[in-house]
């Protein structure tokens, strides 16, 4: 499998393209679909939801999660890498990303 350079990946993001970021085989051994929110639209979200088949995540600072009262997904995080997630949210008034269905409400 061929991988592009970090520089090419950054350029693709700057151009509004989505990329796949893969981690090490000894970690989670998975790929994440990544896009810049300013370039995202309904098609991007639908592609991530249907083809990615996982959570659609938006990185936020801990202070933002606290201000929005977003609880931790797990009270006792035992992940060896300390990966942290808040509880899932799916509401157009509180979510950074939304589908056209939510936008219509």
Regions found by a protein language model. Name each.
Residues 1-17:
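Phosphate-interacting basic helix/loop segments used at nucleotide- and nucleic-acid interfaces
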Residues 12-15, 34-38, 63-68, 88:
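A short linear-motif detector with a strong N-terminal bias
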Residues 43-97:
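Glycine-rich, N-terminal phosphate-binding loop and its surrounding beta-alpha-beta segment
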Residues 98-103:
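Conserved small/polar residues in nucleotide/adenosyl-binding loops
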